[in-house]
């Protein structure tokens, strides 16, 4: 699970995926305010709980979307 305040490579992966899905954010490895807003927007778009926490359901949908945008 990832949430606001987290840092590291997993956050970078999250940010790269969000960016590839069309969200405007910096890939810096810090789960701050902008990343939180992007996650909540992604969750709302995909009918997920809009809690800003990247748990199994949000990760699953992100992986699905990333595969569509960046196949292979």
PLM regions and their residue ranges:
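Acidic, Ser/Thr/Pro/Gly-enriched interdomain connector segments
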Residues: 1-30, 34, 68-72
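Extracellular LysM carbohydrate-binding repeats and other cell-envelope/extracellular binding modules
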Residues: 35-37, 41-72
């Amino acid at each position: 699970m990832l949430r606001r305040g987290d840092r590291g490579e997993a956050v970078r992966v999250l940010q790269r995926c969000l960016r590839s899905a069309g969200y405007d954010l910096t890939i810096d490895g810090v789960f701050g305010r902008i990343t939180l807003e992007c996650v909540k927007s992604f969750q709302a778009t995909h009918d997920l709980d809009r809690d800003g926490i990247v748990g199994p359901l949000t990760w699953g949908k992100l992986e699905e979307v990333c595969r569509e945008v960046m196949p292979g």
